[in-house]
C-alpha cells in the first residue's frame, strides 16, 4: 500500500488515472486475463493430480501448494520453500516473474493471452521436472 499525500499534484494524478486508465474496458480486460490465468493454472494442477488452491480477487491471483488454508498454522504447513524457489528460478530463466513469498500474479489490461498461456505452460514444465514428493523441504 501507499499513502496519498494531500497535495494538488497527487489529486490531479489520481483524477487523471481514474478518468483515463481505470475504465470499464481496462477492468474487463484485466478480469478476462485473470479468468484465463485461473483456469489455466487450475488445469495444470488438476492434470498433475495436485490439490493446490488458487485465490483470486479481481485481477489478482495467487496459488498455494495445497488446499486453501483456514488459519496460519495450515498455511505454514503447506509451505514448500524448496519447490517455491525452484519454481521462481525456473520462471525467471524463462523471462517470467511471479511474486515471491505468496506466488502472486496480477493481470494487466494489455497482457497478451499468449503470455498467460506461456506462464501456465512453464508452471506445468517445472512441475513435470521436479520430484513433488521430495520438495516438501
What would you call each of these model-derived segments?
Residues 1-137:
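Conserved N-terminal phosphate-binding loop of PLP-dependent enzymes in the Aspartate aminotransferase
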Amino acid at each position: 500500500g501507499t499513502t496519498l499525500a494531500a497535495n494538488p499534484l497527487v489529486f490531479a494524478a489520481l483524477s487523471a488515472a481514474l478518468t483515463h486508465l481505470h475504465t470499464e474496458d481496462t477492468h474487463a480486460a484485466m478480469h478476462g486475463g485473470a479468468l484465463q490465468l485461473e483456469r489455466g493454472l487450475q488445469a495444470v494442477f488438476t492434470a498433475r493430480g495436485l490439490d493446490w488452491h488458487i485465490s483470486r480477487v479481481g485481477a489478482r491471483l495467487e496459488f498455494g501448494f495445497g488446499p486453501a488454508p483456514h488459519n496460519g498454522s495450515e498455511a505454514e504447513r503447506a509451505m514448500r520453500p524448496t519447490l517455491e524457489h525452484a519454481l521462481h528460478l525456473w520462471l525467471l530463466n524463462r523471462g517470467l516473474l511471479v511474486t515471491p513469498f505468496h506466488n502472486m500474479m496480477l493481470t494487466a489490461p494489455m497482457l497478451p493471452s499468449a503470455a498467460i498461456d506461456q506462464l501456465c505452460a512453464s508452471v506445468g514444465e517445472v512441475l513435470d521436472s521436479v520430484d513433488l514428493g521430495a520438495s516438501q523441504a
